[in-house]
Structure formats: C-alpha cells, structure tokens
C-alpha cells in the first residue's frame, strides 16, 4: 500500500529506505555480466565483496557472495575477469546501500569473449567506423608526439629511444595508464581526451608490448574504440599482438606491429632525410650545371654568326630594304600621278570638245530669251519660249548681241504657238538668230 507523501507529511529516511527496499525486492533473481575490478576476500570472512563494472559504460555494482562459493570456483576470480553472476538485488535500509546477493558465478571463457569481439567488429564494420576513407594521414614531421603506455614499460622506452635516435628534436607528452585489467579502458579514454585537447600534440601513439589475448581485451572494448573514432588527432595503434588484432588496430589511423615500428612510422629518420636532401641538392646542382653548359653553348653559337661580327650589318641591311621600298613607293606614286594627269587631260579635252565655247568656235551661236521681269536669261530650245517682240541675247565667240524677235516660225511638221506671228517669221529668223 502506498504511503502518503507531501510537504506536510514527508517521509522519514527509514521510510524512504523501506520503500526503496520494497521496490528492489520485486526484481527477483537476475543474471548480470561484467568485469571484475576489485575482490575483497578473506578466508575468515563469511561473505566476500566484489565490484563488477560495465565493460562499455562508467557503471558498477557491488556484489555480495559467500566466501565458500568463491573458494569452490575452479579458477579464482581476479581483477579483469569477465564473469556472469546470478543473484537477487538487495538494499540495506539501515545504511542505504545497494548490493547484489550472488548465488552463482560463471566465468566467461576466452572463446566466448573472442566471439563477442568478432560480433562487435562486424557491427562496427557495417557502421563504417573502420572505413579507410576516414583515416587521417600522419604529419610528416610532428613537433610533439602524445604517448599513452604503461609506466616504466618497455614499450615507452622503445618508442622514445627510437624516436629520439631518428629525430633528436622531437618532443613527447607521455601519459601513463593501465594497459591491462579493468582500469585500462577508463584511463586510456581519459588520456586520449586530454591529448586531443592539447593543440601542440600532432599525433598520438597507444603502445603496449604485446601480451596474451586476455591481457589485450581492453583494447577491443567498444567504449575505447568509439572514442578513438571521434578523435581528430591521428592515432597510431602499437599493441603488438599477432595474429589476433584488437579492434583498436582497425579504428586507428595507422597500425604498427610493435612500439618500435610505431616510432619509425611517426618520426622520420634525420640521417635518411638529410641524405635525401643531399641527393636532391646534388641532382639540382647537376641539372643547373647542365643548363648553364647548354646555354653557354647556345650563346657561343650565336656569337659565331656574321651579325655578331658586325652588329651594324643588320641595321644597314634594314636601311637598304627601307630605301628600296621608298624608291618603289616613289615610282609607283609617280606612275599613278601621271596616269591620273593623263586621265584628267583626256576628260578636259572631252569637256572642251563638247562645251559651248567649242560649239561657238565652229560658227554656232547661243540664243537666250530675256524675260520681261529681267529674271535670269534662259537658253532658247523651242519656239514656244519666244513670241514676237521678245528680247533676245545672241552669244557668239567674241561677244553677245541683243536683239528683238520679229516673228516665230516652227519647223516643218512642228506645232505653231498660237501667239506667234507667221508673217515675218522667215526674215526675222534669218536676220536675228543665225545658226542655232
């Protein structure tokens, strides 16, 4: 039955613990899997205490087990072991503490663990965490190398000695962690995060000098693998175990077979690099010498040309070409001008031959009628322009004659102007106009 609870009627601590105990006891017996991180056992104790942690999360639970049950196990339980326990959750209301009362312990065999790792590897492959396109290339010459390894381990010594021998100026930031057992994953993850935050670190090496399959299980934990996949700083895995590679080898940007190989992969050899530079300089110097020799040969060939013996020769040659071109221009222009003059004279002769002055010179005259309003005189081209009494101007070669029309007579077959006087037309025409 639910106990009322309100600001006016709060629970006492004992009531709270009793309620929690009732809720927990409803769970009944359950199976739980985890990794042993601590075992407190004495032969004189009736009960022993084990801390069991989640292999993927930062979570743990206390186990209470009879000491006799632990002694009867075929293999003693130790830190780092994977176990499956059967028990009932229990809550101690007086202390407010939780524990799992264990009635059975089963140790997880290595075969089963490897099967779980293989299943996890397939899942991560499908997820794309091991895609080569996600790999970050290593820097050519890192200034600072982050190193995660066991304190005072041979792996730490090998990496630093080889790296310093290859490139003495390289710097290291070393973080020592557990490299086997239940503390490995959380400590390595913390170290990775710390080095990732350090902007001076160009590459991270995770190194361990080999070990048994059981010792290397932490480097296949999902938590560690996913943390490495999130890093932007390139990671080199140097766990050093063949042929069963931990999952860290697959997610890392580069895998090295040993810590020594990791140092060789990350840090270039100064002697080799100097040799490469020296060879490149020699090739460059040789290429430059060949180029200079080739250019000198070409310059020598140019110097042997006649033009180089007398530098003014090309100028004189061009002057001759220009003078000849000017002469051709003058000749062509003279011919063209003479042709135009000849054409003008011919046209002038034609104009003169057809002009009025030449006509007058041949005995003809030009008759113009002068209107009564004294406007411009008009050349007479038809009898219709003249009436008896019209004032006429007759032009002859040496002057002009002013006359008056006595009469007008049309040519035979022509039409006579109705105003014309035909009586004296013959005499007037002969005496007044001459030839027209």
Swiss-Prot record:
GO molecular function: exodeoxyribonuclease VII activity; nucleic acid binding
Recorded GO CC terms: cytoplasm; exodeoxyribonuclease VII complex
Ranges where the record places region Disordered: 412-436
Superkingdom assignment: Bacteria
Biological-process GO terms, alphabetical: DNA catabolic process
Keyword Cytoplasm included in the entry's annotation: yes
Catalytic reaction(s) noted: Exonucleolytic cleavage in either 5'- to 3'- or 3'- to 5'-direction to yield nucleoside 5'-phosphates
PANTHER family: EXODEOXYRIBONUCLEASE 7 LARGE SUBUNIT
Listed NCBIfam families: xseA
Protein purpose: Bidirectionally degrades single-stranded DNA into large acid-insoluble oligonucleotides, which are then degraded further into small acid-soluble oligonucleotides.
Family, as annotated: Belongs to the XseA family.
Matches recorded under HAMAP family: Exonuc_7_L
Name of this protein: Exodeoxyribonuclease 7 large subunit
Recorded name of the encoding gene: xseA
């Amino acid at each position: 039955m639910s106990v009322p609870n309100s600001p006016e009627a709060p629970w006492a601590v004992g009531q709270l613990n009793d309620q929690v105990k009732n809720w927990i006891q409803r769970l009944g017996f359950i199976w739980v899997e985890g990794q042993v991180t601590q075992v407190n056992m004495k032969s004189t104790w009736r009960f022993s205490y084990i801390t069991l942690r989640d292999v993927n999360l930062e979570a743990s639970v206390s186990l209470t087990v009879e000491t006799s049950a632990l002694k009867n196990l075929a293999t003693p339980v130790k830190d780092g072991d994977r176990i499956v326990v059967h028990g009932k959750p229990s809550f101690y209301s007086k202390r407010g503490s939780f524990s799992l009362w264990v009635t059975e312990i089963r140790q997880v065999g290595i075969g089963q663990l490897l099967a779980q790792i293989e299943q996890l590897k397939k899942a991560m492959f499908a997820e794309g965490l091991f895609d080569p396109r996600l790999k970050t290339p290593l820097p050519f010459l890192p200034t600072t190398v982050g190193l995660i390894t066991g304190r005072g381990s041979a792996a730490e010594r090998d990496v630093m000695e080889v790296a310093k021998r290859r490139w003495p100026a390289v710097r290291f930031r070393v973080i020592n962690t557990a490299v086997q057992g239940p503390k490995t994953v959380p400590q390595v993850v913390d170290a990775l995060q710390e080095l990732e935050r350090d902007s001076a670190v160009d590459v991270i090496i995770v190194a361990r000098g080999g070990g048994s399959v059981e010792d290397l299980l932490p480097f296949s934990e999902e938590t560690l693998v996913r943390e490495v996949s999130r890093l932007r700083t390139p990671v080199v895995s140097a766990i050093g175990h063949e042929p069963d590679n931990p999952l860290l080898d697959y997610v890392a940007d580069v895998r090295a077979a040993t810590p020594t190989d990791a140092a060789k992969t990350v840090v270039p050899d100064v002697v080799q690099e100097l040799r490469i530079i020296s060879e490149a300089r020699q090739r460059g110097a040789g290429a430059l010498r060949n180029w200079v020799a080739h250019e000198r040969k070409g310059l020598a060939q140019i110097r042997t040309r006649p033009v180089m013996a007398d530098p003014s020769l090309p100028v004189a040659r061009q002057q001759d070409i220009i003078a000849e071109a000017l002469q051709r221009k003058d000749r062509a222009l003279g011919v063209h001008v003479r042709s135009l003059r000849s054409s003008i004279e011919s046209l002038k002769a034609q104009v003169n031959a057809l002009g009025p002055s030449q006509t007058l010179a041949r005995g003809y005259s030009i008759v113009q009628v002068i209107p009564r309003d004294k406007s411009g005189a008009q050349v007479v081209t038809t009898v219709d322009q003249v009436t008896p009494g019209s004032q006429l101007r007759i032009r002859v070669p040496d002057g002009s004659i002013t006359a008056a029309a006595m009469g007008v007579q049309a040519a035979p077959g022509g039409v006579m102007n109705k105003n014309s006087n035909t009586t004296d037309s013959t005499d007037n025409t002969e005496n007044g106009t001459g030839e027209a």
